[in-house]
């Protein structure tokens, strides 16, 4: 069965990896490393949540994914604001799209837990 959240997280992680390779080629190592960690961690936590042991475990993993998503947004904003960093507006758009799906699922999960 297709899972739009999982699919979108893989798409975003792949785009993050490609963008980080561009950053590394431009010798922007520090932010590249930070972005690579947070941007790929989103999907890792979403994938882990798919096999959660309980509803609480699922919610916890999804909350971690949202934190990583927000960190990823932060690094992308810094790159966009900097005059010496290449920007990747498509990546920012995809991260925002992933966030909308993620927040909706998390919100629904929290409400259904009560």
Regions found by a protein language model. Name each.
Residues 1-48, 52-114:
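Short, C-terminally biased terminal segments at protein or domain edges
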């Amino acid at each position: 069965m297709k899972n739009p959240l999982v699919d979108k997280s893989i798409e975003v992680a792949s785009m993050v990896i490609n963008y980080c390779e561009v950053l590394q080629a431009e010798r922007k190592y520090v932010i590249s490393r930070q972005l690579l960690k947070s941007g790929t961690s989103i999907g890792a936590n979403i994938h882990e949540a798919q096999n959660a042991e309980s509803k609480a475990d699922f919610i916890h993993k999804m909350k971690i994914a949202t934190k990583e998503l927000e960190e990823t947004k932060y690094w992308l904003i810094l790159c966009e604001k900097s005059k010496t960093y290449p920007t990747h507006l498509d990546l920012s758009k995809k991260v925002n799209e992933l966030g909308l799906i993620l927040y909706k699922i998390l919100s629904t999960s929290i409400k259904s837990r009560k």
